[in-house]
Regions:
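Basic helix-turn-helix/winged-helix DNA-binding cores
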Residues: 1-99
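Structural motif
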Residues: 4, 98-102, 149-153
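Positions in alpha-helical segments
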Residues: 11-15, 108, 124, 157
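Residue-level signal for short amphipathic helical patches enriched in basic/charged
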Residues: 20-23, 35, 42, 113, ...
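Short, flexible helix-adjacent loops and helix caps
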Residues: 37, 65, 91, 115-118, ...
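Amphipathic alpha-helical dimerization/coiled-coil segments
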Residues: 88-131, 135
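Mid-protein regulatory/catalytic core that forms ligand/cofactor-binding pockets
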Residues: 120-186
Length: 186
């Protein structure tokens, strides 16, 4: 993808098209509106321009469904270029600041990971996520320990809330990793 097309919406569309192809823009909009990806805008002003950018960049192909009753529907399929781009994005290593700045992206990547790259990739991803989260939690706890005497009560409580949120995500990642490890053992 060109730099301007490296948006989470673009990758979400690539992942969904891969799983549901062929699908129309309307099908994708409905999925965004009523499902777990509701954080993305389901407006035609977001989805259709993003689909056009993906088509222009060769990530998806579009054909017209002549069998539609009322009007022809554009049906999207992932191209080999789109599959490769999606795979590269999914396989990116987790960087230290990803847990601080890009948790929604990490969870979006994880949601497509098994279908695209298999359970082994999920296990590796979760192992890396646990390590990254634990490093970040340790850094925050050290900061709290070193600075709590200088911090206001509200600042300490806000920081503790952040730590607890990361601890919750780390606990989830360990639970998910255990599930993958158990499935490998069977």
């Amino acid at each position: 993808m060109a730099t301007s097309d490296h948006s989470l919406l673009g990758y979400a569309l690539l992942g969904l098209i891969r799983l549901r192809q062929p699908c129309s823009g309307y099908d994708l909009r409905r999925f965004f509106a009523g499902g777990p990806m509701a954080t993305f805008s389901d407006s035609p002003g977001s989805i259709y321009p993003a689909l056009k950018r993906l088509e222009r960049s060769g990530m998806v192909s579009c054909t017209l469904d002549e069998t539609a009753r009322v009007r022809r529907r554009a049906l999207y399929r992932l191209s080999s270029k789109g599959k490769n781009s999606l795979r590269r994005w999914l396989a990116k290593p987790i960087k230290a600041d990803d847990v601080l700045r890009r948790m929604p992206e990490l969870f979006l990547r994880f949601s497509f990971l098994e279908d695209c790259l298999g359970p082994g990739a999920c296990k590796s991803f979760l192992e890396s996520l646990v390590l990254s989260l634990q490093a970040h939690i340790t850094m925050l706890q050290d900061h709290l320990q070193s600075n709590q005497a200088k911090m206001s009560r509200s600042a300490r409580l806000a920081l503790r809330s952040g730590i607890m949120g990361y601890e919750s995500q780390a606990a989830w990642a360990r639970m998910a990793l255990d599930e993958y490890r158990k499935s490998n053992a069977n």
